[in-house]
UniProtKB/Swiss-Prot annotation:
Source organism: Lachnoclostridium phytofermentans (strain ATCC 700394 / DSM 18823 / ISDg)
Region Disordered: start-end pairs: 23-45
Biased composition (Basic and acidic residues): 28-42
UniProt protein name: Nucleoid-associated protein Cphy_0047
Role of this protein: Binds to DNA and alters its conformation. May be involved in regulation of gene expression, nucleoid organization and DNA protection.
Amino acid sequence: MAKRGGFPGGNMPGNMNNLMKQAQRMQKQMEDKTKEMEEKQWEATAGGGAVTVTVSGKKEVVSVKLSKEVVDPDDIEMLEDLIVAATNEALRKMEEESASAMNSIAGGLGNFGGLGGLF
């Protein structure tokens, strides 16, 4: 029975082999960049600096700092809003930098296989 499709001897042609090597290099670069980003921290403030929140690249809140002036037992809701605002801004900064870093690695793909917009 004749063998259909494939390549004689099971070898990939040169271009396919190069593409696979390039994909493996890119995967390694993305893994390295992901690890690097996980070790970084981003900080954001709200209320004119009254609340400062620091988040990690693992999307974890590392610290929350409050100035004495913002702690008002009669207005807990404002303090809660400021903490949420600072946290969201710190996470937005982290996501933006992370996406930019991944795009710099995967940017050469264009929209190859629909993957271009993933990062």
